[in-house]
């Protein structure tokens, strides 16, 4: 069993006993890890603190991925509830990326995150990049506090882990990841349901995947990139725009890959960067983004900034190529 900071455990345990209301937060454009962590914690509260109330903020508005697995809220949560709540923020590296921003209304805030620390914005924080996923952190947290995992918690945690580790294939996967996964499997949760929720996509989304792959350009230095036109996703019947960076995974000779699309809700360009072994979060940070060593994201005001980012990364790869030649 790993050891979590006893100061964090002690303080969080006291807050769980003190507060009756819990507002749970994820990052903008939430993925299965963010939701997996938040809904696993909500399920934990429902079992061990049944008289307390908890809601995952902003989940009532989610249109796409996750609705077949997570019990999204039916309606927005009233500010009066939030003002009397303990806000717990999951999988979010900086304050401006907290979905709804309602955490600022809460009485106190807690943050649980596995991204490299770039800022502090909660009263109590547990930040540890050694974990493969925020959901993995929640699983260990529940166990470390002396509670058991049930099948519902396990399903949500497993969804988060397989998403952020790319089915246990990424370098972020550790022995502790497999150790927790073994405990999750012991609960007997329905793995097929989780796999279907995470991986099954409509035919039109597969066609969109192919479109992105065909749209991509690959430089001689090993950079693959795709800049998607505004509204492209609509012609494929996709409910909301997606980064689709995974369309460029596993191309031989490609060392770094990135995509960028226009988000009509926030009127900005959103992009993702991935690599297998080259640290790329520093590139995202140059443009106000951030993330993990090999997986990062950014938000831009102008698509020309994306092409500048492409130029910077390609120059970096060219220099690496020269050094290694």
From Swiss-Prot:
It comes from the Bacteria. Pfam families: DHH (PF01368), DHHA1 (PF02272). One of its GO terms (molecular function) is nucleic acid binding. Belongs to the mgp1/MG371 family. PANTHER family: BIFUNCTIONAL OLIGORIBONUCLEASE AND PAP PHOSPHATASE NRNA. This is Uncharacterized protein MG371 homolog. It comes from Mycoplasma pneumoniae (strain ATCC 29342 / M129 / Subtype 1). The lineage of its organism: Bacteria, Bacillati, Mycoplasmatota, Mycoplasmoidales, Mycoplasmoidaceae.
